[in-house]
């Protein structure tokens, strides 16, 4: 530890103690909050099933920065490079299309064995795994419907895919000793005016009930469902709306996934957390950055990211909220995108843990809104960066932008050689 860091740490300890905050306790709490990194930033959501296929489902990854991962070996190497530069506990979130097999595997036939390499890698890197069925980028999703499809055979294919995915998820949890959160998102919807909005939702309701009919140990597997306002090509009607999935998660007691980009631009998920937690047992968060639409830009340390973190900490939701990231930017170095977004999420959590919440709550309860606002603003100037730097040092990761040197060296030595 350098003398400069020691001095900054001691000063920070004194400054935060003056407002009733124990920074050592804040760092202990931060180590209770893993962030689940999404594998698909590394290859623009291509996967290994059909890497040259088109990305469908009303989502887009824009840009053509060189060096994207082309196979599982490259993707895991890129992830390892990112993991080394991010302090504290992490998880990895996989989609079904990231299976590994020497022969083609239909999505309704995926099995745990197709993900055994990921499990062994996760063990070696001390990571938990989360999972997602992939209900897009497939011939049987080309007309815009999957679990709500009017054709019973096609609908059953997607039901069976999701059921098979749950078995993979439970395998992850059993092998790694930490529950895998499996999130179901489907692109189902219509481009233009829709006459029958009820029937697809009735079919989706019945399909989901069949999907979750097999019981798994919650210590191994947790179901989550995710809504969306619209997607490209499904601007007028989305089967899995917010109201549909809020009702489903409440009535079936599954986890509810809130994606920062899946609502109207004037809505924020930070305001939805406390409301949803009254009715559902768990929340899965997909922290993202929507720019005018669900663009999935890299997460910033901005007001909404901070507000999301603050809601988790202020209400002590550590054991009920699962923090995941969901962005994919192909216009910049993909390893750097992981590092920037994940570090920003962790910085937001740290800042939330350093807030004098008890004091603020007392001011609010007493009606002293002037002091509440004043203290909220003044605490932004407290030396949280020194606490972050100490956290990084203790986890043997760069504290400032020095991590970029490592990414540039990796790009020169590895990424630039990929065609």
UniProtKB/Swiss-Prot annotation:
One of its GO terms (cellular component) is cytoplasm. It holds the Pfam family RhaA. Coiled coil: none annotated. The keyword Isomerase applies. Pathway: Carbohydrate degradation; L-rhamnose degradation; glycerone phosphate from L-rhamnose: step 1/3. Its EC number is 5.3.1.14. GO terms for molecular function: L-rhamnose isomerase activity; manganese ion binding. It is an enzyme of class 5 (isomerase). GO terms for biological process: L-lyxose metabolic process; rhamnose catabolic process. Keywords: Cytoplasm, Isomerase, Manganese, Metal-binding, Rhamnose metabolism. Its main location: cytoplasm. Catalyzes the interconversion of L-rhamnose and L-rhamnulose. This is L-rhamnose isomerase. It comes from Salmonella newport (strain SL254). The gene is rhaA.
